[in-house]
């Protein structure tokens, strides 16, 4: 197993005793209500998923990441982990203050020391991180709508986890717990699979091919904030469960969730996803076509080419896969490397196509989804899952 990024797994989660004392303390501090995606960031900082980060970035770190894809100390990092605040809050806060971060349910999430307050050039941020300044890009929209005032500093302790809706708590495992699980299984080579969609037949094929030379696979769906038209996390989890139970060797699969949010930053986010999975104990990660992409903002294999530039610093190794499809002649999943038949015989699968079918109330065919998965999706899409 690889060491965590930067060498040490961060842990900022309050013990039960600390939690009681700090919850009382939070009532005496300046209160800042933060959006769900920053609540997710608090958890990822505190549980070690964002190691070596121990808080929200200062201006120096944020600009270094935006411009040079590294922290100010030279360590590889691809996505700015920053905390935007409103102008009133920004003006009231002084460097050195302790503040209490609250979620929209009025729960204290974390106590933070303000080490920096600053502005950023948002056009430069978006151009470098997302390769576009187009407000229609979901990541750009988040950045630009959040404003240009930021505070940075260490998270002292995480007091409460984000509100979970519909997902069994057993799947919320912190990096230290996943690492322990992997160690107990005796796995040395672990491939991670990132997903924000139900696993269709093309995904299943790629995971199984990737698993062949490995000891185990970490199916690690992202359950933080995604696009409004993405399928909800609780529905996706049911799909993963039935797929693993019916079509995988259960002994070779680890299923848990990643409580991070999507940025849709394509090539840069591929690095971000790899570093998080390295912290969770993976040695390899599947990077497929248009990884963490959206629309037509990135090239099909741009993320794969991009991560190749950083393999020495990443340490976790990318497993790169071309597009796979169902071939009606082969009567099986295949890729251009393995299938001799013309394109007319290929049924190309994607999460986008599955979502479009579901919006129209159509059941995904067996070439797209396993029947058990299709049952769950069509029930959800037609409102019969209540």
From Swiss-Prot:
Its EC number is 2.7.7.4. The keyword DNA repair does not apply. GO terms for molecular function: ATP binding; sulfate adenylyltransferase (ATP) activity. Pathway: Sulfur metabolism; hydrogen sulfide biosynthesis; sulfite from sulfate: step 1/3. Coiled coil: none annotated. Belongs to the sulfate adenylyltransferase family. This is Sulfate adenylyltransferase. The lineage of its organism: Bacteria, Pseudomonadati, Aquificota, Aquificia, Aquificales. The gene is sat.
């Amino acid at each position: 197993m690889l060491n965590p990024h930067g060498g040490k797994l961060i842990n900022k989660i309050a013990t039960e005793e600390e939690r009681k004392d700090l919850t009382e303390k939070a009532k005496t501090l300046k209160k800042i209500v933060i959006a769900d995606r920053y609540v997710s960031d608090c958890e990822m900082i505190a549980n070690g998923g964002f190691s070596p980060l121990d808080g929200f970035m200062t201006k120096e770190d944020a600009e270094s990441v935006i411009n040079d894809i590294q922290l100010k100390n030279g360590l590889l990092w691809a996505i700015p982990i920053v905390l935007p605040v409103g102008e009133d809050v920004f003006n009231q806060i002084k460097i050195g203050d302790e503040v209490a971060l609250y979620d929209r349910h009025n729960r204290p999430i974390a106590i933070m020391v303000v080490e920096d307050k600053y502005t950023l050039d948002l056009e430069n941020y978006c151009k470098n991180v997302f390769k576009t300044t187009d407000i229609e890009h979901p990541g750009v929209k988040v950045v630009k709508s959040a404003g240009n005032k930021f505070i940075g500093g260490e998270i002292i302790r995480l007091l409460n986890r984000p509100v979970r809706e519909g997902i069994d708590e057993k799947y919320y495992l912190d990096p230290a717990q996943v690492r322990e699980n992997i160690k107990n299984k005796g796995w040395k080579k672990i491939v991670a699979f990132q997903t924000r969609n139900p696993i269709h037949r093309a995904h299943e094929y790629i995971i199984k091919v990737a698993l062949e030379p490995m000891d185990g696979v970490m199916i690690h769906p992202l359950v933080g904030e995604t696009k409004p038209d993405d399928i909800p996390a609780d529905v996706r989890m049911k799909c993963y469960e039935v797929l693993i139970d019916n079509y995988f060797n259960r002994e070779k699969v680890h299923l848990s969730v990643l409580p991070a949010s999507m940025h849709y930053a394509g090539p840069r986010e591929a690095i971000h996803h790899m570093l998080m999975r390295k912290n969770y104990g993976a040695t390899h990660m599947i990077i497929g076509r248009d990884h963490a992409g959206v629309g037509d903002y990135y090239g099909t294999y741009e993320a794969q080419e991009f991560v190749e530039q950083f393999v020495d610093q990443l340490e976790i190794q990318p497993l790169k896969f071309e597009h796979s499809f169902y071939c009606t002649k082969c009567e099986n999943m295949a890729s251009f490397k393995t299938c001799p038949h013309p394109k007319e015989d290929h049924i190309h699968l994607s999460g986008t196509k599955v979502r479009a079918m579901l919006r129209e109330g159509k059941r995904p065919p067996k070439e797209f989804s396993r029947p058990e998965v299709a049952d769950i999706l069509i029930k959800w899409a037609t409102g019969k899952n209540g």
